[in-house]
Amino acid sequence: SNCTDSGTDFQTYEYYNGGGDLNQNAGNNSPLQYVCASSAYARDATGDGIQIAVVDTGINASHSEIDDNMVSALSGSDTINDDDNPVDDEGHGSHVAGIIASERSGAASSGSTHGVAYEADIYAIKIFNSSGNTTNAAKAAGYALIEATAAIDIINNSWGTDADCTSESNCRSTIGTAFFDNWEDVSQLSTPKISVWAAGNEGDAEPSAQCQTMLYNTDISAVSVCVVAVSTSENGDDNSQGKGKIATFSDKCGSVAAFCIAAPGDDIWSLSHSGSSHTIKSGTSMAAPMVSGGLALIMQEFSSLTPAQVVSRLLSTASDDSEYSQSSIYGHGMMNLNAATTAVANLQTINGSNLLDDPNTSYKDLVNNSFTSSAAFSNAINSALEGKVMEVYDSFDRANFEVNINDFFSSSSYVSQNTIENHMARLVPKNKQKVKHKNLYGNFSFKVDENFIQSTLFQSAGDFLTLGYNQSTNSFENAADPLSGFFNDNAFGNKYLVNPYFYTGSGQDYFMSFNGNDTYGFDTFINGNTSDLGLAFNFNPLSSTNGDKKYAGDLQIVLGTNYEQNKFLNSSSTGVFSTGDMSNTNFTGLKYKKNITDGLTFVGSGFAGYTYIDKAKNSYISDSTPLLTSSFTVGLAKSKFIKENQT
C-alpha cells in the first residue's frame, strides 16, 4: 500500500462502507482506502470551504447524510425543466453527490457512509430529466450558470458523449457548440474552474468526446481531468478483471493519457434519491466524483496553488507502478491522496517582497535554514516558539506546507568561549596594584589573584591613571575543563538554575581606571571569535579604599554595551533566519564578592540586558522588539580552588 499509517483513526465503519460490503472487514474493498483518503484526513484535509457543482440529474438535498453540505439551489439550476428546483427524480445525481461529500457522522449503522471530501459544499445543477435525457441547450445553460457563480471551484460531470473527435472544431460540434464555448469560458476565468469528466462505460480504447476535447484546447486541458474506473472486487465478480484493475465496462485513457487518471468506480455504495436510503451503482460516473472529492482535498490543503496546479499535483502524484504503469489504460495511474498531500520534491523557505508573485523571490531548501541559539536564551526562545508554525513550499509546484518553527531551532551548550552571555558576569573592576611610576612607558607590574587565579598586567600613567591588560588563563570564572561537568543543565538538574551568563572561557581585555580612586573604571573586551566588541563601565560604591566600608565586601555596578556581527546574543543563523551586520546589547548588572573567611569567598551577581537585533534583508527575523535577558549567580569560592597551570 502507498498509504500511511497516520490516518488509521479515520478508517471507521463509514469509511469502509463505500465498498458496498457494509462491514469493517471490507477494508480491502473500500474505495476510500484505495485512494489513501485517510492519510489526507490525518493532515486535516476534509474539503472544507471548497464548493463543487454536480451537473447531473439533480440531488436529494434533504438526505440526512448530505443535507448539511448542500448549498441553497441557484435560480434556474434545473436547466432541463427551466425551474429553480433541481430535485433528483432519477437517482444518478444523488449517488454521485454522496461519493463526493456525504457527511462523516461517526455512525456505525448499516448503510452509513461518507464522501471523499465530507465537508465540501455541493451545488445541484440539474441537466437531465427523470428518464436520464438532456439537451445541448440544457448542458450549455448549466455551464453558463456555473460561470456566473464565482464561488464554485470544481465541476463534476458524470456523463459524456460516446463519440470520437479529431480536432478542436470537430470536438466543438460533437459535444455542442454552445456547451463547448461555455466550458472554454469557465476554463479561462481569472480563477478557472476545474472540470472532471467520466471517461465512459463502453469498454472502448478511447474515452468520451469530452475527454478527447482536452487534446485540442490547452485552456480546457489545463484544468480538466478524465477519469477511468477500476474495480475493488476480486476477479470473477461482476465487472471485475481483478482487484484494482480496470473495470470491464470502463473506457480506457487512450490518447488522453496525459489528462487521465484512475479511481474506484465499481460497486460503490452511496446515497439514494429516495428518503435517506442508500444504493450501489457502478460506472465511470462513480469514479469521477472520487476524483472531484480528491481535488477538493488538495485544493483545501494547498491554498497557494492555482486550479491548474491542483490538477497537475493530482496527476503527478498518482500511483503509476506495476499495473498502473500502463498509461494507455490508466493514464497517470491510480489517484493517491497520500502522495498528493505530501511534498513531491524538496521543501523550501521563500522570501521576497511579494513572495510567490515576486520574480526575484529566493527559495532555500530547509536544510539551508537554521538558527542555533546560545545557551543564554535557548530556554526562552524554545518556550516562545512552542506550537508555532511557518509556511514552507514544495519546490515541485510551490504547494504550501506548515512545519513547526522549532524544527529549525537548536541550542548550543555552555561552551568554553568568550561570548556576550559570559561577559556580563565577567566584567568586574580589575585587581589594581598602587604603583608610583610616573612615566607612561615605565615598568610593568604583575599580580595574580589566588581566589580566581586571574593574571593582571598593568602600568601606571602617572598619579592619575592606570592602564592595564588582563589575561584570564585558568581561573575559577573560566575553568571550562575542570568545571565543565558541573556547570551544565544535566548536573544541576534544573535548567533555570544555570546562570546563562556564567563565564567559562579564557579571554583577554584592556582596562583603564583612576589611580586615586579604584571605585570606577572602564573595561573593553574582544570575544574569541573576534567579531564582537564591547565596552563596560564599572563602579564600586563599597571600595576597599573607604575605611568605613572596608568590611562591607566588594560590590560592583556594571554598565556596558556589546556589538555582535551577523548574530545576536551569540546565536548563529542561516537562510531566512539570518541577522544583520551589527546587533548590540546594552546591559547592566551588580556583582558582589565578600571574603567570609580567609579561605572562602561568597560570590553573587545579577545582570539584565536589552538586545537590539539588526535585521538582514529578506530575513524572517524582522520588526522585533528589543529582547530583555537576565541572569543571576550565587556561589562560594574556595581560595586556590583551582591551581595555576591546572589541566
Task: Put a short name on every predicted segment.
Residues S1-G49, S64-E65:
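Protease zymogen maturation seam
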Residues D56, T213-A296, Q300:
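Extracellular S/T/G-rich loop segment that most often corresponds to the catalytic His/Ser-adjacent loop
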Residues D463-T466, Q508-F511, Y520, S543-V558, ...:
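Repeated loop/turn-to-beta-strand initiation elements of outer-membrane beta-barrel proteins
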Residues C3, S38-S75, D82-N136, A150-D153, ...:
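Subtilisin-like serine protease catalytic core
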Residues N29, I152-N156, V223-C226, Q300-Y414:
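C-terminal subdomain of the subtilisin-like protease fold in secreted/lumenal serine endopeptidases
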Residues Q471-S475, T504-S506, G516-Y520, L559-Q565, ...:
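Transmembrane beta-strands of outer-membrane beta-barrel pores
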Residues F444, S455-Q459, P500-F502, M512-F514, ...:
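Residues on the lipid-exposed face of transmembrane beta-strands in outer-membrane beta-barrel proteins
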